[in-house]
Amino acid sequence: MAKTLYEKVFDAHVVYENENELPILYIDRHLIHEVTSPQAFSGLKMAKRRMARADLTLATIDHDVSTKSVDLNACSDMAKEQITTLMQNTKEFGVRLLGLGDKNQGIVHIVSPELGFTLPGVTLVCGDSHTATHGAFGALAFGIGTSEVEHVMATQTLKQAKLKTMKIECKGQFQKGVYAKDLILYLIAQYGTAKGTGYAIEFCGELIRNLSMEARMTLCNMAIEFGAKVGMIAPDEITFEYIKGKEFAPKGEEFQKYCEYWKSLRSDEGAKYDESITLDVSKIKPQISYGTNPSQVIGIDEKIPKISDFKNQSEQKSLLDALSYVNLEQDQVIEGVKIDIVFIGSCTNGRLEDLKIAADILKGRKIHKNVKALIVPGSMQVRKEAENLGLDKIFIEAGCEWRYAGCSMCLGMNDDKANSGQRVASTSNRNFVGRQGKGSITHLMSPASAAACAIEGVICDNRKYLGV
């Protein structure tokens, strides 16, 4: 029977199934961080249990760490407590920790691929909703709750219902100034934040085959904002080249054997999907969010919708509530809206490729006098590579702040926050009410668009800086 990529990986990991019961999956990789792990470790201690496979667990510090310094004392009291607790727990249970000062420390969904801990065909979980990021490698990756974190620690297994499957085929090529971030924002805008609920998504097609691993990770990262639990892309030569030589990756002849197996991790001809979507990506323009959920997105040259554009009362109310919060109007042009802060970073767009894109626009230019711009590499490895290329100098000379690795302004859990009423051009993944600080206003966009906004001090079209 022909199978989809998702079905192949899921079925290969079922260790127990019985009628009227959820299947039990073996978990190959477990990622943990300082926020969702303390209760899980406490549960193990109370039950006097050890971890089943500490060697298959990788810990990092990312969510509430300071990005101004690698000194623990630069963190808030809450952050210090969570970080210290993780340090103690990982030492006690024998888990590898990428702690403060570690050359590989960074955002969990960036450091794992960098180290080759994320591999095609594995099951991978983390107490974080954006775990779908790792599906870019053909891994079955999804976020779990704290009680499930403890269960994986204790048993290396998890009960999991089989999801429906959705194919999203992307045809054509991007216009100049359009990126993977624009594609996923466009997709969510067209179909809503609930379209993917109950599905494992597979991105495929001409465009996907030509994307870098960084761009693929951006796509899969925001599958969760589409409503899906899982986003996947079949591994190929681009995937293998990215993995080759990394710390946890197979080496030598073993690597070649794995590559042969990984080549089988693609949907069979004739495999049935529960739903399919086909997109012509050549029509997509730079996308900007205007409201308070990731479906409230328009092209840079479009106007904010009017209430009459929606027939559903709940959608009408959602629009009015959002516009009231963000202080914008129906039928207003989004271009030209004043920006206070620019944030380039996060597990969505904090990789080297993202920083290169931003630097290309900022090179030789200055940011607007009324704008504060934070450039936050997603890992210390990204930071080092960026500095080797001189990107830090470009950012600093432009007037940006060059920070250390962490989740930073993606969420209001650390010291990098916007004040009430401040408007942020952000490369992160969520624009919820107060997401970047109480009363803050978030506009989601690509690194190129964010860099252009930093220069002009208003929401603008990045393509004018790319010769378009």
UniProtKB/Swiss-Prot annotation:
First-level EC class: lyase
Cofactor: [4Fe-4S] cluster
Matches recorded under SUPFAM superfamilies: Aconitase iron-sulfur domain
KW Transit peptide (keyword) present: no
Protein residues bound to [4Fe-4S] cluster: 347, 407, 410
Reaction catalysis annotation: (2R,3S)-3-isopropylmalate = (2S)-2-isopropylmalate
GO BP terms: L-leucine biosynthetic process
GO MF term list: 3-isopropylmalate dehydratase activity; 4 iron, 4 sulfur cluster binding; metal ion binding
Pathway the protein contributes to: Amino-acid biosynthesis; L-leucine biosynthesis; L-leucine from 3-methyl-2-oxobutanoate: step 2/4
EC number: 4.2.1.33
Amino-acid biosynthesis as UniProt keyword: yes
UniProt keyword terms in alphabetical order: 4Fe-4S, Amino-acid biosynthesis, Branched-chain amino acid biosynthesis, Iron, Iron-sulfur, Leucine biosynthesis, Lyase, Metal-binding
InterPro entries: 3-IsopropMal_deHydase_lsu, Acnase/IPM_dHydase_lsu_aba_1/3, Acoase/IPM_deHydtase_lsu_aba, Aconitase_4Fe-4S_BS, Aconitase_4Fe-4S_dom, IPM_dehydratase_rel_enz, IPMI_cat
Function (record text): Catalyzes the isomerization between 2-isopropylmalate and 3-isopropylmalate, via the formation of 2-isopropylmaleate.
Subunit structure, as described in the record: Heterodimer of LeuC and LeuD.
Family statement: Belongs to the aconitase/IPM isomerase family. LeuC type 1 subfamily.
Name recorded for this polypeptide: 3-isopropylmalate dehydratase large subunit
Organism whose genome encodes this protein: Campylobacter jejuni subsp. doylei (strain ATCC BAA-1458 / RM4099 / 269.97)
